[in-house]
Amino acid sequence: MRLFTHGQVLALLAFVNTISATPSFSTNSYPAHPAEPVSLFSQHQPQAPLGLWTRLRNSVIERVWGVPPQQRHRGGNKHQYPPFSAPASLRARYGDDVVLRFKLQTADEVKALVEASNILFLDVWSSTDEWIDIRLAKDVVPSLLGLLPKSLQTTHVPLIRDLPQTIYESYPSPSQSPSGRERGFLPSGEPSSDVTNIFFENYQPLSVIVPWMRLLASMFPSHAQFISIGSSFEGRDIPALRVGVRPANDQKPRRTLIIEGGSHAREWIGVSTVNYVAYSLITSYGKSKPISTLLEQFDFIFIPTINPDGYVYTWETDRLWRKNRQETSLPFCPGVDLDRTWGFEWNGNATGDNPCLESYGGDKPFAGVEAHQLAEWVKEQTEQRNTKFVAYMDLHSYSQQILYPYSYSCLYQPPNLENLEELAMGIAKAIRLTNRKTYAVSSACGGLMASQKKKAKPETFLRMESTGGSALDWFYHDFGVKYAYQLKLRDRGSYGFLLPRENIVPTGKEVFNAVMMLGRFLLGESNAFQELDWDAGFQRPKKDDKPILNDDDDDDADTNDDGIGRKDDSWIPDEYKGDNDRDESDGGWAFRRLRKR
């Protein structure tokens, strides 16, 4: 049990009192037409008093949606609660939008779909060499099909038939249950296991995340520090946690890893996952020898969202907003894609010159304010703070992929390709042994599905959007970070960006184990770390004590240990049912020992 000094306790109490005296954050701006309230019960139900953090979360939901305290709905979890219709404001904004998946076979099909999506200004959700997911209104479907070759007119399937309803169910629901677990919202001295911490039972708005980060740092000051990377276009801090224990007399450059999420505002699972990994490392220090060793050897910079303006906008106005919120040359098309604005090979595919495009990278390199702030921060840390950045992990969604450089072109290979692939394969296997989830491994230029079923088709490398100017390429090429990856998290399309909240903890476990594998790889084969029981540091799935580092295949298990699944999946095409539970053969994914020192 952790002991706090008298001064720390007083500071903590003062902080909590400040929050409890503030029912909501008045600095937030809320939509002009909030969602209509939906009543769960027809008659009044007695309620137990709600605790501090639930009141804080409820106040955010009430202010955003305009829901009176006595008329809170319990949407956001259709697996446990009865379904409710999406409010009129969501129907008005998203209409009868759907998400369709198109299967791709030839380069001509890719080219036709690229041209059609640009003509109709469609929202491309995800793309690989096998399929492309596109959001569009139902009444636009005939126009799209009319622009496509016959081969594509019959090879599309619906992934989301009712987008407003799915969006409505993705928002967290204000709790009306007794507050017996309220203390679970606060950081504790125990590492997170399963869903014991209420913070990870729902996606959280920025106005809850930032106080939580500050409190976490105040409770573990020996190895956690709350910092700001810079300021966003709208003046918000870009919050981060620095986690690590640096020896007082160590004059060597401090090896540092960056774990970042939320570049694209609508990808909420990346934000929650960064927080989960940070929480797990911080609360496990001193209890797990492998984790303690990592924090003594490295600093970790956790940035839940580099795009705070966009993230707030997804909570208050448009759940599917992708870019940041800065002004462009067209007043009616604001925002810059923060993963297409970096300086290396900026706008490499020459398709991002239209501010209305989702992948618009700005009118010059580093036009995106927040990307420029992060680039300047890492330069300052290197030049003035004796820091050496050795790894970069950028969390996105969706499609379950582990991508390494380069993104801008498939014609060039990174010099340490073998090492990048080896580590990526080790990360993929650690994830698969966590929750039976298969993550593809590929170069980011194609975003290929590494199913091992067929070889990549170079002629299909024509992309649906610009892939130049990515953070992945800049950190690797211009900044010299040897191990740079982009992880596209769950799922493979059943929910896309609207991943249900039940996936927060399982996805967090997967990426936590990925970070552990990354740290183990970076420590290398030094004799000083030979005796560490690395498996003790990994988070295991429920009802399974199989070691994460076991090199044996485990392909005979086809169940989901986390119990995550869709109860009503009758509308899903048969070929996509259980697409998150496929457990394909390892192929060549064994964690090889071939890297060159």
From Swiss-Prot:
Disulfide bridges in this chain: C333-C356
Skewed-composition ranges (Basic and acidic residues): 563-580
Cellular component, GO annotation: extracellular region; vacuole
Stretches with biased composition (Low complexity): 170-179
Biased composition (Acidic residues): 550-561
Cofactor binding summary note: Binds 1 zinc ion per subunit.
Signal sequence bounds: 1-21
Required cofactor names: Zn(2+)
Entry binding sites for substrate: H264, A265, R266, E267, R322, D339, R340, S397, Y398
UniProt xrefs under Pfam families: Peptidase_M14
Subcellular locations according to the entry: Vacuole; Secreted
Domain Peptidase M14 residue range list: 202-522
Region entry Disordered, spans: 170-189, 543-597
Chief place of localization: other
GO biological processes: cell wall organization; proteolysis
Binding sites annotated in the UniProt record for Zn(2+): H264, E267, H396
Purpose of the protein: Inactive carboxypeptidase that may play a role in cell wall organization and biogenesis.
Family the entry assigns: Belongs to the peptidase M14 family.
Protein name (Swiss-Prot/TrEMBL): Inactive metallocarboxypeptidase ECM14
Top-level taxonomy: Eukaryota, Fungi, Dikarya, Ascomycota, Pezizomycotina
